[in-house]
Structures are given as structure tokens and as C-alpha cells.
Amino acid sequence: MVDLTHQVLPQSIAEGSYYLQQSVTQFPRGTVFLAVVDPGVGSSRKAIAATAGGYFFVAPDNGLLSEVLSQLGGLEEAVELELPADASNTFHGRDVFAPAAGKLAAGAELSRLGRTLPDLVASTGRTTIFREGQLEVTVLTIDHFGNVIFDFPARRGWEQLQPGNKFLIRGKRITFWPTYSRVLLGESLLLWNSSEYLELAVRNGNAAEEWGVKVGERVLIEALW
């Protein structure tokens, strides 16, 4: 059993989705992922178990799995988990999700855990907006170093993001480079992080503090011609 993280901000479905997406392929097929970011606990949202790409997932049906399922080629099968009569109204992670994950890890068939679902709730809040020479993104997460990761993977493509090109963020100029070492200590830059997501960083510094941004905020990046 591997404990991936407990550092996802409370109720931040998008941040939880990002970490799940980055982690899944580091594990062998057949791995069961228990993922609980559940601001809707006790509501009508479904508790689910699903499979894609040879992996299994147990989670609330609130969009948390959307990105990782898409990454793995799409949903293959999903079921709605039944709530035990004595389940807490506020702690489904303990009373619903964890037991289901344990059953899957012990070899239970997914189809025996509940009734089949044709589809799942799609994620919301990770919408990138393109305009002429502009990119509006959301802060997905801020890592231990204070690096700011945006909801924009390299595969989406934006031709302006080339080494040496300059941009404007909140009135400040910044340059896109491939590595931290291309700038002086304390200087900011844009780059692709190790997961190929757009990152705002400060060399040997804390970009989140320097730029005053928080998880969930929208940020406008303007290309300077």
C-alpha cells in the first residue's frame, strides 16, 4: 500500500485530479487507486468504482476521475457503490470507499460491487481560454517549492511558448525557458514542468509568494510581440 498524498487542498477536486493523473502510470496495471476529494459527501453524488487501462479507481463521482480516465483511453466500466446502512453521513472515505478498494485489491470483480453506470460526471473548472496572443489558465496546484502549476499541458500547444519568448503576467514581464538554470537566482520564468504542464517558477525562490497566486485562481498570460 502506498499513501500518495494528504496535501490536496480541502475540496480542491481539480488539484486532486492532477495528482492522480500524474501518479497512475508510475504503478503497475492492476493497481487500485482510492481517491477521496469529496466536498459533496452526504449529498446525492454517487460513490463509484471504475476501471480504465488496466487500473482500478474508487472515488466520488464528482469529476475527480475525468482527467485520468481520459489519459488512459476512456472509461471501460463503472459501478455505483451501495451505501451501508450504518455509513456515516460525513465520512464515506472510511465507510464506503475504503472497503470497496479493499475488496478490489483482494480480487473481487468490479461488477459485483454495484450496479453498472453508463457514464460518470465530467470535471469542471479546468477550462483554458485562448484569445489572440493570450492564454487564460487556472492554478491547479502549488508544489513544495512554491512552483505554480497551471492547467495547461504541453500537448495542448500554444505556439508562443518558445524558449526566449517574453510574456506579461499581472503587469510583470517574464520569459519562457526550458530549464531553471537559464535565469539568475531569484528571477522568474515560465517552463514545462517534469509532468509537461506549464509552470511559473522562481529560481531558488517561491513563485506563489512572489506572484501572490493561490490554487484555483485564474491567471492571464499575454504574449509580448
What are these language model-derived features?
Residues 3, 7-22, 26-37, 42-95:
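Active-site histidine-anchored catalytic micro-motif
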Residues 4-6, 36-39, 52-53, 60-62, ...:
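Fold-independent oxyanion-binding glycine-rich loops
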Residues 25-29, 41-42, 49-52, 72, ...:
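Solvent-exposed alpha-helices and their adjacent loops that cap or buttress functional pockets
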Residues 88-151, 156-161:
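Anionic-ligand-binding alpha/beta catalytic cores of soluble enzymes and soluble regulatory domains
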Residues 149-212:
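A conserved acidic, glycine/proline-rich C-terminal tail/linker
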Residues 215-223:
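Surface-exposed interaction regions enriched in Ser/Thr/Asp/Glu
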